[in-house]
Curated annotation (Swiss-Prot):
Note: This DNA polymerase requires a protein as a primer.
Record-stated family: Belongs to the DNA polymerase type-B family.
Subcellular localization, as worded in the UniProt entry: Mitochondrion
EC number, as in UniProt: 2.7.7.7
The protein's name: Probable DNA polymerase
Any one annotated GO CC term: mitochondrion
Source species of the chain: Ascobolus immersus
PANTHER family from the UniProt entry: DNA POLYMERASE, DNA-DIRECTED DNA POLYMERASE
Length: 1202
């Protein structure tokens, strides 16, 4: 117990800033470590009494030299005073001049297994009634690291007493937890971690008394050591056991991760609950390398603290915005299955759009970029793997998969059946005289190890034996199982098929020479069903809403105008002062009983408008949300009108998800009267919005002119003619916003009529284009009981490995006279041409050719690729740029559509199959594609039906591959959120400005609705599309410069038999480059040999919205190999209800993580070669240095260039 005076000082030489969790998650931490007030009071009493009796002494020391001041003065031990069950020490035992700095400390010291001391300090400021300081020192000699954590002004003491919900030593506490507790009450307090291996040697010395002095004398370290308060204690200080529970702090040694403590008692209590492991590292690139580092730490921690072999893990990214996002879904794993977990999460990092409304703008992303932020893991030990709700959606993907039990005997509780149809080798078989039947008597055991007799009756036919095994129970005969052996056409008793049927389930075994070569089981699923046609379309429900925003001096977008049209009346509001209050008032006019059931469509709700309106709506009623990939697809508000008990509801949907094009282009495509107008939006930016401006039309520079929306100077002149120095800002802003609402309403109404007239589907029942096309297919074209509905099952995630995208590679970086060809509707042509996997899938362990002569489906195979210039079979592999889908040469394993491997055989590929899922063949899309293609061909390109048919043709196939794990979102009040957090396990949350909390929960599909997914369909369509493209890649390998899914760039004209402007599945010649460069996949540009669409050049850079010149792209390749561009990105911040426009650098460089770069003598990239794999690992040099004359200087020059 001390009186401590702490001089205020600032932190210097900060190494990093700890990122804080959101309020909702802090409450979650609070609920987990709560301890009753009385328990703490009793513990403190006993502790103080124990100290007084033992007259314990502590050494003191002061600090100076700019690092703060610490004065420790021994004081008499006070007697605690209990007032109304509130614990406060008696103040009159302290000097009055120090009263504002008097602190009562609770100090616990624990000796670690390394013989070092660990100190925990809790301080109570006697005047301010705040827990004032908490400090950990953790030493780890094995890794020679030193960590100090300092937390100031920890907890408020409420009502002149101690609020100890968050106070005492929790069962598992780390630096993140402490930081959160601090910021809960003191948002402005900074908390810092310090990690300095240079000062480790100071702690390894036996004399700790010189620690502070030596630190202050180290000038090189003086700016990086904490400057608030360093606790120093005596070696001989004994441990403190407080209260009846004897809560000992367990010191756990870690290297570069958080310091954790746990209590022995509470650890067992929540053993099978959810636990969180936070990373202390921030990554500019969270790729598979970052995953590997943090998962290694997680597994190390789990091994030290848990004994359960199975546990489920949810991985999450925390973005710089403070928002969080899951990577994939819950994965059941074991300590021996770490590599599988890393590969699984890496696949989700590669395939999922991690950068969404919760994090960044999608414009900041290109193929080589991964999210920024830190990682955390929620994990839960499992009592057993069987029967858990997680067992169905694990991701059991291993490259070294082995069929473990393929050769074991059929064994039913002790019954072994011979692997031959030669009946002379069957023991205990008694045949009748004509040898057409027989009987077997055997004894087997039940589950309780009780023996009982069974009788097998065999019927012998030509090439087939059927044995029915029965058991006598209480004078009744019970059928147990049936075995049917058949040789087929082989007439070989040692090569036959055995079907075992038990309780309606069948398993097929194929035997050859007394060995099991194939095991087949039915995988029973339901089927995607037809739906009824909609007799009418609810046109009256179609309403529209639009927001206009301005940018303030902090580059934040702020709403200034809102219009909505409810199919009868336009309402428009200007936000001149407090936009949030004014928007709240505007929405109150919308929430009327007359609007009940209306659907207000907002163009780009998911990425833009929802950021501004979500929090406002949450203040007015109950919010239900449909989100996918963090895109708000639908907001539904349920509300009551004052004085009435009736509940009403209104929905807000994103029309851009239904019609993915700009409003300007849609206005032209649908040829509506109310076409989108123009407005000088840049004129609204700045410190003050010129609402009262009336005068000349603002200058041309205030109008946006982009590649997607041209506004020329001639357009500006025409616009100005309508005004004569009487341009009214308020009037024109309202007009602009209102026309957007009317235009969108006209487009959606026309779209709804056309879809219903043609297909009898009501678009107002659906939220996206893919769901509309799926409904059209199910209503008009779906064959009954054919497409398996594969949802929350292991099979979905196995076959998803076979679902990879199209080819996307660069083969040569520059060239002249380059022809660009694109296939007419690649995916629709594959859908129309090929059979799809349908029916009940059969799971086969072993070679499926042993089961059937013509297997069809997906196989797990070891592939050997020949030395092709352009390989055509893809696999996922770890490269320098993370996990990439590549087409290599060499040997590798994976899941594939068997037809794709058969197609590759003619080019020299070989493969060995060890497992398969077989389906029935059926062409299910031919009629659907033919109908849409006929519609498209019947209209001119300027007709809306042409536009609609083209959209529908390309919007169906991906719907079948939708991930069956869905997510539940909800918006709760602060009170509801605190209760929710106490009872929920896997939660991510964003606290909105109002204090309401947006929750995201991972839930298995079964807890929601049937999503009707069938990933084999999508995987097959993608594979057949690659098969179509493979013919061109092989035939024109010597001429190929780049490929991008459905198009190729070659330096020759391809055979005319492959070319057609309209025919489905053939190539269309787009243009010819006079010269071109191909910097990376999806990054290329060139000069046209003649104008194309009124352009002389084109540059395509994935992820770069702002246009750049071909000369810039050429410089990247020819000169520096690296060029930086400054681009504008829209950073959506739901937590602040705003969007920030931020300038960010975009680095453009020659890169290839998918092929080997080939250099010439001058260090210039001249070509690429395929990666070479051996057993799934890269063995080729990722940057191959070559030259024609063997000039040794080429290696040095090129290496420097790289």
């Amino acid at each position: 117990q001390f009186s401590i005076k702490v001089m205020q000082s600032s932190y210097v030489g900060l190494r990093s800033t700890v990122q804080f969790l959101q309020l909702s998650q802090i409450i979650w931490i609070k609920s987990r470590i709560a301890k009753s007030e009385n328990d703490y009071i009793n513990s403190m009493k006993k502790f103080l009494s124990h100290k007084k009796q033992n007259n314990r002494k502590f050494h003191t020391r002061s600090m100076s030299n700019g690092l703060g001041s610490l004065n420790l003065q021994k004081r008499p031990t006070p007697s605690p005073t209990v007032l109304n069950n509130k614990f406060l020490p008696t103040r009159n035992q302290y000097h009055s001049e120090d009263i504002n700095n008097n602190i009562l400390f609770d100090i616990i010291i624990k000796e670690t297994d390394k013989g070092l001391k660990k100190c925990v300090l809790i301080g109570l400021n006697l005047t301010t009634n705040k827990i004032f300081n908490m400090e950990y020192i953790d030493l780890n000699t094995s890794n020679r690291k030193f960590k100090i954590f300092v937390a100031n002004n920890l907890i408020n003491i409420k009502n002149n007493g101690i609020n100890i919900d968050n106070l005492y030593i929790p069962k598992r506490i780390n630096s993140k937890t402490l930081t959160d507790l601090i910021t809960l009450s003191f948002p402005n307090i900074k908390v810092q971690w310090y990690l300095k291996s240079e000062i480790t040697n100071l702690f390894l010395k036996s004399d700790y008394t010189n620690f502070i002095k030596e630190i202050n004398e180290r000038k090189t370290l003086g700016k990086s050591i904490l400057s608030k308060l360093i606790i120093y204690y005596n070696d001989s200080s004994p441990h403190c056991n407080i209260g009846k529970s004897s809560r000992k702090v367990t010191a756990i040694s870690h290297t570069k991760r958080d310091i954790h403590t746990s209590t022995e008692n509470n650890h067992k209590k929540d053993l099978f609950g959810w636990h969180r492991f936070n990373s202390s590292n921030y990554y500019d690139c969270i790729d598979s390398g970052a995953l590997t580092i943090e998962i290694n730490k997680l597994f190390e921690y789990y091994k030290d603290n848990f004994t359960q072999p199975f546990f489920v893990v949810n991985a999450k990214i925390k973005f710089p915005t403070g928002n969080v996002r899951s990577i994939g879904f819950g994965n059941v794993t074991t300590l021996t299955d770490k590599e599988t977990l890393i590969k699984t999460l890496a696949i989700f990092l590669e395939r999922e759009d991690i950068h969404t409304v919760m994090s960044y703008d999608e414009g900041d992303i290109d193929e080589s970029k991964f999210p920024k932020g830190s990682l955390s893991f929620d994990f839960k030990p499992l009592k057993t793997i069987e029967g858990t709700k997680y067992a169905n959606y694990t991701f059991p993907i291993k490259k070294d998969i082995v069929v473990k039990d393929i050769n074991k005997k059929i064994n039913f509780n002790g019954l072994d059946l011979p692997k031959t149809m030669d009946l002379s080798k069957w023991p205990n078989l008694k045949l009748n005289k004509d040898k057409t039947s027989g009987e077997i008597r055997m004894t087997i055991k039940n589950k309780n190890n009780q023996s009982y007799d069974i009788i097998g009756h065999m019927i012998i036919n030509d090439g087939e034996n059927v044995i029915t095994f029965n058991r006598a129970v209480d004078n009744s005969i019970i059928k147990i199982f049936t075995v049917t052996d058949s040789m087929g056409n082989t007439n070989d008793p040692n090569l036959f098929k055995r079907i075992v049927e038990e309780k309606g389930n069948q398993t097929v075994y194929v035997y050859e020479n007394n060995e099991t070569v194939c095991v087949v089981q039915d995988k029973k699923f339901g089927f995607i069903s037809k739906i009824a046609k909609n007799k009418t379309v609810n046109l009256k429900s179609i309403s529209t809403l639009d927001l206009e925003t301005r940018m303030d001096t902090n580059n934040r977008l702020i709403p200034i105008c809102m219009s909505y049209y409810n199919n009868k009346k336009l309402n428009t509001f200007l936000f001149k002062d407090d936009w949030q209050e004014e928007m709240l008032a505007a929405f109150k006019t919308l929430l009327k009983s007359t609007n009940h059931g209306k659907k207000f469509y907002v163009h780009n709700l998911a990425h833009f408008d929802s950021v501004f309106i979500l929090d406002t709506l949450s203040k007015l009623g109950k919010i239900d949300i449909i989100m996918r990939d963090d895109k708000i697809m639908k907001l539904k508000i349920t509300f009551k009108i004052p004085g009435k008990n009736t509940e009403y509801s209104i929905s807000f949907l994103d029309s851009l998800l239904m019609l993915p094009n700009s409003l300007d282009n849609l206005s032209k495509a649908f040829n509506i009267e109310n076409k989108k107008s123009v407005f000088p939006l840049k004129f609204t930016n700045g410190a003050v919005t010129p609402f009262n401006y009336i005068g000349a039309v603002p200058g041309y520079e205030y109008f946006y002119n982009t590649p997607n929306k041209k506004f020329t100077k001639d357009d500006y002149k025409k616009y100005c003619k309508d005004f004569n120095n009487n341009w009214d800002f308020n009037k024109e802003l309202k007009n602009y916003c209102e026309i957007d609402c009317l235009a969108l309403h006209d487009i959606l109404t026309l779209f709804a009529k056309m879809i219903h007239n043609e297909f009898s589907v009501d678009i107002t029942r659906y939220v996206s284009l893919s769901s509309i096309t799926f409904a059209i297919f199910r209503t008009n074209f779906l064959p009954e009981n054919k497409i398996p509905n594969i949802t929350c099952t292991k099979l979905h995630y196995i076959l998803k490995q076979a679902y990879t995208g199209g080819y996307c590679d660069v083969f040569k970086p520059e060239g002249k006279n380059i022809h660009s060809y694109d296939i007419n509707s690649l995916y629709p042509s594959a859908m129309a041409k090929f059979d799809m996997p349908t029916g009940t899938p059969l799971h086969i362990l072993g070679d499926p050719y042993k089961f059937t002569k013509d297997p069809f489906g997906f196989v797990f195979a070891e592939v050997t690729a020949p030395d092709l210039k352009v390989p055509i079979i893809q696999t996922r592999v770890q490269t320098s740029g993370g996990v990439r889908t590549v087409a290599p040469i060499g040997t590798f394993k994976g899941w594939y559509l068997l037809d794709e491997l058969i197609n590759a055989k003619k080019y020299g590929y070989t493969f060995k199959i060890s497992e398969a899922y077989l389906f029935e063949r059926l062409n299910i899309f031919k009629e659907y594609i033919h109908r849409l293609y006929t519609i498209k061909s019947s209209y001119t390109p300027d007709d809306p039906m042409y536009f609609i048919a083209k959209l529908l043709m390309n919007s169906l196939y991906g719907r079948f591959g939708m991930d069956p794990i869905t997510i539940k979102y909800s918006v709760l009040t602060p009170e509801e959120s605190e209760e929710k957090l106490k009872n929920s396990s896997c939660i991510e949350a964003t606290t909105l400005p109002s204090g309401n909390v947006l929750f995201k929960e991972n839930k298995p599909l079964g807890e929601f609705s049937n999503l009707n997914t069938s990933v084999p369909i999508s995987a097959a369509i993608a594979a057949y599309s690659r098969m179509i493209m493979s013919e061109y890649l092989i035939k024109y390998a010597d001429n190929l410069y780049a490929v991008d899914t459905d198009g190729i760039k070659v330096d020759t004209e391809i055979d005319k038999k492959y070319v057609s402007d309209k025919e489905l599945g053939l190539m269309k010649h787009e243009y010819t480059f006079k010269e071109a460069v191909f910097v990376a996949p999806k990054v290329y540009g060139g000069l046209f040999d003649k104008p194309y669409k009124n352009k002389v050049e084109i540059v395509k850079v994935k992820g770069l919205k702002e246009p750049i010149q071909y000369s810039d792209l050429k410089d990247v390749y020819i000169k520096s190999l690296l060029k930086l561009f400054i681009i504008l990105n829209f950073l959506r911040q739901l937590a602040l209800s705003t969007i920030v426009i931020k300038e960010q650098p975009y680095s453009l460089r020659v890169s290839s993580f998918k092929r080997v770069l080939v250099f010439n003598e001058s260090g210039k990239i001249i070509s690429t070669l395929p990666l070479k794999l051996e057993n799934d690992k890269i063995v080729s040099n990722p940057h191959l240095i070559v030259n024609s004359e063997g000039n040794p200087s080429a290696f040095k020059l090129s290496l420097i260039k790289i």
